[in-house]
């Protein structure tokens, strides 16, 4: 097939509830959106899904299957992004906040949730239970955006307008957040971690740096430390520095911390 417009498929509400993004989540009647750079792996996942009686597979031209249930779209990337509107039709009107750093993401996210109020939802390392009914995939610090929007599209989650996300280096490196824009992002710190994936500190830092690009964020907050200042040197976005320096945008003092804890 050449280019595809999802509206041509006239999905029912039941179809949309059965949208999935992994062969692990396929059940009879599922509509699977899937792609992979490795053709053999893609064919394997598609074959697994067909055996599970998937209703429809929407994939890229990279797939070899000629099964009638498989639609191969030349414009798969556009089609996949369009699926987000079906999962959560108001997702673009929500405010997103991203937090990255080796340590402190979870704590910062929890504080931010309290500051932003009851319309706020924090998604990160410890929120695996939120996704237990969404996907059978292993919970990630930064879940797939597809699954996040599937969660936000559920009636119980429609009330959340401020979405706070832990942004892991893996997720940023794999472009897992493509499709949303962060109102404000934050950088906490950086130390040696995940070298099994990134191999060195510079690759690790460059993955984190993606969050502070024009493609993903409008502005950001950073801590006055070695790597925070490197973020500021490498990003052209408006920024706010948190420091004990009296010239900082946001002043941090031990007295202020003591007052908060008392």
Protein language model features and the residues they cover:
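N-terminal leader/targeting and accessory segments in enzymes
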Residues: 1-82, 86, 262
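Acidic, Mg2+-coordinating active-site environments of NTP-dependent enzymes
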Residues: 59, 63-68, 158-161, 173, ...
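Walker A (P-loop) phosphate-binding motif
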Residues: 86-128
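P-loop NTPase switch/communication element
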Residues: 128-144
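Switch II (G3) loop of P-loop NTPases
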Residues: 162-170
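Conserved helix/coil segment N-terminal to the catalytic DExD/H
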Residues: 171-177
């Amino acid at each position: 097939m050449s280019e595809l417009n999802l509206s041509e498929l006239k999905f029912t509400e039941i179809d949309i509830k059965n949208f999935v993004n992994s062969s692990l989540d396929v059940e009879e009647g599922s509509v699977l959106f899937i792609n992979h750079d490795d053709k053999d792996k893609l064919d394997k996942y598609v074959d697994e899904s067909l055996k599970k009686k998937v209703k429809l597979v929407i994939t890229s031209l990279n797939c070899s299957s000629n099964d009638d249930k498989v639609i191969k779209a030349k414009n798969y990337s556009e089609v996949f992004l369009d699926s987000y509107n079906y999962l959560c039709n108001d997702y673009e009107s929500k405010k997103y906040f991203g937090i990255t750093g080796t340590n402190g993401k979870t704590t910062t996210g929890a504080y931010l949730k309290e500051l932003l109020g009851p319309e706020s939802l924090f998604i990160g390392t410890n929120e695996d239970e939120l996704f237990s009914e969404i996907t059978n995939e292993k919970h990630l610090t930064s879940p797939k955006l597809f699954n996040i929007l599937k969660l936000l599209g559920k009636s119980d989650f429609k009330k959340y307008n401020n979405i706070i996300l832990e942004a892991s280096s893996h997720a940023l490196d794999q472009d897992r957040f493509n499709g949303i824009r962060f109102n404000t992002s934050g950088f906490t710190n950086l130390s040696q971690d995940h070298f099994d994936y990134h191999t060195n500190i510079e690759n690790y830092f460059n993955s984190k740096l993606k969050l502070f690009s024009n493609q993903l964020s409008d502005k950001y907050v950073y801590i006055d430390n070695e790597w925070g200042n490197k973020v500021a040197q490498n990003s052209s976005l408006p920024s706010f520095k948190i420091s004990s320096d009296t010239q900082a945008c946001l002043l941090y003092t031990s007295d202020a911390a003591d007052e908060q804890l008392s």
